[in-house]
Amino acid sequence: MPSTDSIPKSNFDAIPDVIQAFKNGEFVVVLDDPSRENEADLIIAAESVTTEQMAFMVRHSSGLICAPLTPERTTALDLPQMVTHNADPRGTAYTVSVDAEHPSTTTGISAHDRALACRMLAAPDAQPSHFRRPGHVFPLRAVAGGVRARRGHTEAGVELCRLAGKRPVAVISEIVDDGQEVEGRAVRAAPGMLRGDECVAFARRWGLKVCTIEDMIAHVEKTEGKLETNGSG
């Protein structure tokens, strides 16, 4: 199975370049550890994500649009955990799902509606009453300490927002390989997830910066120091 272990470091972009692209409102591709999920997410800042960018994200990802945000933000927006006892293998902290409570929102599933919900999650004046529950965007509660505390895409999204000076809400979704068409049949052959160098190739195809969470941790530790412990959940 392809993994980041087999990819030369030179194939990845420098973290300052990734941060700058993120600051510019671009997608970045972020890979986690091969011993963890061994997957890559498209990540973008929620505050400026457009309908067109959301459409791209839905097309090239699992379609499950998540919005990592800080613990303080989930509290301020009254976003409790989705379940009392989280059985997710990685402890991904899903809150209740939301749509934007807005005149232009229809069913909540369109690219327009989901982009709007994400922007509203990041809006400085956002209030709990600005959202319908349940909805079609899935906020994720990040742990305090960012990627130094937990090596997940949830924390990577919030960390990128912090490093780029953005509002502390990101938008993420796993990148997939949707397989090949089968002529005359309503199926696709050999679907799966993009992994390892396939993710780098995807980033290059679309002109996106690409990095690993491992490199992000190294950058933050070099510039800001280490935490007492480094989580892996």
From Swiss-Prot:
The record describes its quaternary structure and partners as: Homodimer.
Q: Where is this site: Essential for catalytic activity?
A: H136, E174
Answer yes or no on keyword Phosphoprotein.
Answer: no
Gene (UniProt): RIB3
> What are the binding positions for D-ribulose 5-phosphate in this chain?
D41, T92, R150, R151, G152, H153, T154
By sequence similarity, the record places it as follows: Belongs to the DHBP synthase family.
Gene Ontology CC annotations of this record: cytosol; mitochondrial intermembrane space
Q: Indicate the enzyme's highest-level EC class.
A: lyase
User: Which terms in the Gene Ontology molecular function aspect does this entry carry?
Assistant: 3,4-dihydroxy-2-butanone-4-phosphate synthase activity; metal ion binding
Q: Which residues bind Mn(2+) 2?
A: E37, H153
The domain of life for this entry's organism is Eukaryota
Where in this protein does the record say S-glutathionyl cysteine is found? C66
Binding locations of Mn(2+) 1: E37
User: What is an annotated GO biological process for this record, any one?
Assistant: riboflavin biosynthetic process
Q: Quote the catalytic activity from the record.
A: D-ribulose 5-phosphate = (2S)-2-hydroxy-3-oxobutyl phosphate + formate + H(+)
Q: What is its EC number?
A: 4.1.99.12
Q: How is the cofactor bound?
A: Binds 2 divalent metal cations per subunit. Magnesium or manganese.
Can you say what this protein is called? Answer: 3,4-dihydroxy-2-butanone 4-phosphate synthase
Q: Where does Mg(2+) 2 bind?
A: E37, H153
Q: How this protein is processed and modified after translation, per its record?
A: S-glutathionylation is reversible and dependent on a glutaredoxin.
Give the pathway: Cofactor biosynthesis; riboflavin biosynthesis; 2-hydroxy-3-oxobutyl phosphate from D-ribulose 5-phosphate: step 1/1
Q: Give a short account of what the protein does.
A: Catalyzes the conversion of D-ribulose 5-phosphate to formate and 3,4-dihydroxy-2-butanone 4-phosphate.
**UniProt binding sites for Mg(2+) 1:** E37
Give the keywords, sorted: Glutathionylation, Lyase, Magnesium, Manganese, Metal-binding, Riboflavin biosynthesis
